From Swiss-Prot:
Coiled coil: none annotated. Its EC number is 1.16.-.-. It comes from Halobacterium salinarum (strain ATCC 700922 / JCM 11081 / NRC-1). SUPFAM superfamilies: Ferritin-like. Its main location: cytoplasm. This is DNA protection during starvation protein. The record marks 75, 154 as: Involved in iron nucleation. GO terms for cellular component: cytoplasm. The dps dodecamer comprises iron-binding sites for iron translocation, oxidation and nucleation. Fe(2+) atoms are initially bound to the outer surface in proximity to the iron entry pore from which they are translocated toward the inter-subunit ferroxidase centers via two discrete steps. Iron oxidation proceeds by transient formation of tri-iron ferroxidase centers and Fe(3+) atoms move to two distinct iron nucleation centers where iron mineralization occurs. Fe cation 1 binds at residues 52, 79, 83. It catalyses: 2 Fe(2+) + H2O2 + 2 H(+) = 2 Fe(3+) + 2 H2O.
Length: 182
């Protein structure tokens, strides 16, 4: 536990940024949106890691690798979100408790499910995050924060790409023969 008595920045407070010419009111709106995205992406990250660790079956290797890479992508997106929150004069959500409490996406429980169910759950979270990111991109643009909007668009491209891959994995076409399924 930290022995520091005086916090340099208080969670929930937004100063804005003179360097970025972003006043506290506009910055606070962006920070709130970015912190919500940060919480959601970290939930996604942990769920992807869970599925990466527990995947089994005929497509194990491909799915194991994909889920690991998708988790890395989610972590990179989360890092960009947190860095931008800080640049705008806010404090990024960091504790597991805060991240889970602030997430608007449903967290999968601790049980292990078949990979089709797991991927469907992942795709649902991706969909929720994609919708929120689009809304927050528009918010940032409307507030004149074009850099945040650009950063969100870049993350959105990565997240949409992984969601699209999951959609392909969930298709009915397979190389596994019917006999192997029985």
């Amino acid at each position: 536990m930290s022995t520091q008595k005086n916090a340099r920045a208080t969670a929930g407070e937004v100063e804005g940024s003179d360097a970025l010419r972003m006043d506290a009111d506009r910055a606070e709106q962006c920070v709130d949106a970015l912190n919500a995205d940060l919480a959601n992406v970290y939930v996604l990250y942990h769920q992807l890691k869970k599925h990466h660790w527990n995947v089994e079956g005929a497509e194990f290797r491909d799915l194991h690798l994909f889920l690991g890479e998708a988790a890395e992508t989610a972590e990179e997106v989360a890092d960009e979100l947190a860095e931008r929150v800080q640049a705008l004069g806010g404090v990024p959500h960091a504790s597991p408790e805060t991240l889970q409490a602030e997430a608007s996406v449903d967290v999968e429980d601790e049980d292990v499910y078949d990979i089709r169910t797991s991927l469907a759950n992942d795709m649902a979270i991706y969909g929720d995050i994609i919708e929120a990111t689009r809304e927050h991109t528009e918010l940032a643009e409307n507030l004149g924060d074009h850099a945040t909007a650009h950063m969100l668009r870049e993350g959105l491209i990565e997240l949409e790409d992984d969601a699209h891959h999951i959609e392909h994995y969930l298709e009915d076409d397979t190389l596994v023969t019917q006999g192997a399924l029985e």
